[in-house]
C-alpha cells in the first residue's frame, strides 16, 4: 500500500505538495495538500488562508487525465469529511479518474467558520426555534466569527470559493476537470463552469 501511495504521489506536480493521509471510510490511501490563498484577491499580500484538499487516486493503471472534483452541499459541508460515502458513490469514476475533494473556504479545515453556541437541544422545541432567539444567536455568531484572523465574512462567497478550487486544479496540473455537486454543491459547480469554462 505504501508503494502505491508513493507512486500515486509522483503522478502530480511537486508544487501540489501532496502527502499520504488517511480519510475516514476510504479503503485506499489518499493524498492531502493545501493551497495558500489570499482571503481578499484584491489584496494578494493581505490575510492568507490555506484551502485544504484530498485526492483519492484512481485505482486503474491507465487512468484518465481529467479528475473528478466533488462540490459538497450546505453551504458549509466539508468535502473531505464526506470522503468515505462519496468515494463509494463515485466508485465508477474513481476507478479511472482521480477524485478531488476540496474543503471550500469556511468549511472543514479551510479557514473554518464555526460558532461555539450554547447547547439548546434540551430546551422545548418552541424555544429552540423561536425566531427572535435564532436571530440573536446569529448576531452573536457573527461577532465571534469577525474576531477570527480571517473574519472578513464578505470574503466567504461562492465566486471566491470556486476560484480557490481552480487554484487546486492548477496545483494538480489538470488542464480539464469533471464536476460533481450535491445540493448546494451543484450551484458551486455551475459557478465554477461560468468562471472557468475552459477547464
Q: Model-flagged regions — what are they?
A:
Residues 10-199:
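Gly/Pro-rich cap/lid or specificity-loop segments adjacent to the active site
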Residues 1-5:
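Bacterial N-terminal signal peptides
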